[in-house]
Structure formats: C-alpha cells, structure tokens
Amino acid sequence: MLPTLYTCLLWLSTSGLWTVQAKGSDTDMSTRNPHRDLAPNNVDFAFTLYKHLVASAPGKNVFISPVSISTALAMLSLGARGYTREQLLQGLGFNLTEMSEGEIHRAFRHLHHLLRESNTTLDMTMGNALFLDHSLELLESFSADTKHYYELEALTTDFQDWAGASRQINEYIKNKTQGNIVDLFSESDSSATLILVNYIFFKGMWAHSFDLESTREENFHVNEATTVQVPMMFQSNTIKYLNDSVLPCQLVQLDYTGNETVFFVLPVKGKMDSVITALSRDTIQRWSKSLTMSQVDLYIPKISISGAYDLGGIMGDMGIADLLSNRTHFSGITQEALPKVSKVVHKAALQVDEKGLEADAPTRVSLSAAPGPLTLRFNRPFIIMIFDDFTWSSLFLGKVVNPT
C-alpha cells in the first residue's frame, strides 16, 4: 500500500487579504526575525505554483494557500532522505548553501507561531496532523522533529477499514475547522497507509465593512458567452487604489482587522493572462509603493468558491519530479519502508461577505469643488491575493472566474 499525502485542507471565510510590505531594513528584520528568511522563497514559490495551476485550469476558478503547501512539503522533508530531501527543499526555493535545513525548519516554526499568536482580533486556526495505519510505527526522530518544529499531531487509524478511517479523519478536520470542512473524504482509497494534513481555518473582519443594505443583484460577465447574477457588495470610502501604468489592470487594497490585507486586481478585459504572468515579488512591492488613497465607489461580488487539486504533476513541473516516483526515499518517517507518496492533494475554500468590525456604513467624504469618486466594479474575472504584512507571507492566492 502507498502513503497518501493530503496537504493544506483549508477554509477561508469572510473579508480581508494580506500584503507583503517591508517595515524597516530587510537585513535588520531578517536578522532579528527568522521567519523573514522564508519570505522571499515562500512568495516566489507561491506565484510559481499559482501560475502553474492557473495554466492547468483555463476558464476556471483557482484558490490555494501557498504557505500551507510550503509547510506540508517542508514538514515532509524531515522524513525524506538523500536526493529526495534535497529536491523537496530546492523545489521550495531554498539554497542549502545559504540556509541550512535546521534554519529552514526553525523559521517555519517561528512563522507559524506568529501567524497564530499575533492576530488576536482574528479567528485563525492552523495545525498539522498525520494519520497512519495502526500497523506502522513512526521513527522517534521524525516524531520528535515534526512535533518540535510543526506541532504535528500523530494519530493512528485502520486504513483496512476505509469507511471508519475516513469518518475519523473527517471528524477531526470538521472539529479543527469549526465545522466548515465536512465530509472531506468519501471515496474509497484502499492504497492509503499514511495521510498528512495541514489545515488552516481563518475568519476575518473587514476594517471597514461593506454596506449590507446596498448589496444588490448584478450581472457578472464570466466570459463572452456567460453572464451570471451575483450579490454585488458596495462601499464608498477612501481606500488604497491604483490604475497601473505598467500592467493592464486596476487594483484596490483592503485591510482586515489585524495584520492581514487583500489585493483585489481587476485586469482589463482580455488581459488576465498578461497580469498573471507578471505577478512576482517585484510587482507586489511596486504596487504597494504606488497605491494612493482615493475616494472610490467600490463594487465587489460576494464570493463562495473552492478548489481541490492533485498537485503531483504540478510538483514535477516545479522541480520536485521524484515526489511521486519509485525513486523517492522516505525511510525517515516510519520503521517500515514507505515506497513512495501516492498523492499530493490540496483543498481550499473562500467566502467573502460584507461583515466588518464597524457596524455602521463607511463615511463618505465629498467636497463641492472636488471631483466625484471614481467607480470600480469587479463584474468580470479578477485576482484576489491575501497576505500577512507582519510576516510577509502569501497566505491565499485566487483567480475568480465565477464568484458563484
């Protein structure tokens, strides 16, 4: 039987996204905060993975949590040996001559601590669990290292009884995500002997809420042939806005309460691919510096999307070619030999609605001599990106083709 790796089982709910904005010197912050050493690699990995997934799913919604995938693969490397371990870490963008394996895992540990503990105004749960067949026994070194660096919870189950095992795993995920991910596993998977789960539950509140009474049904143009009705949210406020002179798009940056911020990016009609191709650390930094406070009448649809991806083929394209092959070497996980990983599955979901910390409608300021607010209506496919601006982490990336 082959071990199955299910990574990054997520639920993101309500209203806010996150930005990569440096505060002070990169060198000084990196020296004092090991999580900052991860930021460049994690962001580069995030956009590379995102572009691969978008290219593999033309005309479809895409939504992922890159930091969760990075976490799962880094954690898996603790059980890998030889070239398999080297390939995993290099595939995540790490140069082992510049950053040791110990430094990588210590930085992930620090990052997860900050993401969990620094956002006291948000409802966020992060964690890692490993379900293994009762016939297997974890190596003491793997158990100790994964618990120390990733707070991994190891649980045994009977994979010969898949119905019972799936109920156990589903109940665990349901409880950890406050009931928002249910019935995750349903189909029989008799090949599984080990399932690794990395989960995130996040529920945020907009720093400035949308006006609930102003939400109206409007057209959303999925493509030339398809138009759907969506509940379109509205707020009129002074917000960060940019009409990009380099890329064919407009964007706004909205904040959650806490450290999280969201980019909503609206490409010019027919130019989505051009904008996605250009997404990078440099692009985000340029946008962050170029955004200006502007009076905007903003229309964004309520969103309810989810994504499920088998990342095996994508990992191969990104330089982790041996992950699903017979050449893999995961002898550092259990006493018994595990021949290879059979699946790398990522699941995520997103809901965005009007709710914010402020119950009243945002204040609209207008002067008789000043020009009126500009109108920005997200009524065609757009990009959504969520960052944590304290850790510089790319938490969620999405392409919304159909918000329903």
UniProtKB/Swiss-Prot annotation:
Keywords: Glycoprotein, Lipid-binding, Secreted, Signal, Steroid-binding, Transport. The keyword Ligase does not apply. The record marks 249 as: Conserved cysteine within steroid binding domain. Residues 1-22 form the signal peptide. Gene3D superfamilies: Alpha-1-antitrypsin, domain 1, Antithrombin, subunit I, domain 2. Cortisol binds at residues 253, 285, 392. Transmembrane segments: none annotated. Major transport protein for glucocorticoids and progestins in the blood of almost all vertebrate species. PROSITE patterns: SERPIN. The gene is SERPINA6. This is Corticosteroid-binding globulin. It is found in: Secreted. Glycans are attached at residues 95, 119, 175, 259, 326. The keyword Secreted applies. Belongs to the serpin family. Glycosylation in position Asn-259 is needed for steroid binding. One of its GO terms (molecular function) is steroid binding. One of its GO terms (biological process) is glucocorticoid metabolic process. GO terms for cellular component: extracellular space.
